[in-house]
Amino acid sequence: MTIYALSSGPGISGVAIVRISGKETSKVLKLLTDKDLPKPRVATLRKINYINTSELIDEGIVLWFPGPESYTGEDMAEFHIHGSKAVIDALHHSISKVENCRLAEAGE
């Protein structure tokens, strides 16, 4: 199972970081950005869209960490997006539409 969560913590902020880890990470990155994977461990500016549409969620920094050389040991990515609740919720909702992806539980 691929899991995702807000890793920068809740609350008001200018930037939020959403981390995703697991087998479907590369698929999610490609679907959300409509592009090939960025170079590993290189911060890349990308437009982030709702899955299967061209409707923009946000424009932010994307980082790709292929496993096993990642923090989790699995394929992992980070989305550095604007910190509004609406943007965070839209990204979470879009990721949830990918099969085998779910919101992480506490401590995962």
Stretches found by the model and what they are:
Residues M1-E108:
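A glycine-rich (often HGG/GG-containing) alpha/beta subdomain
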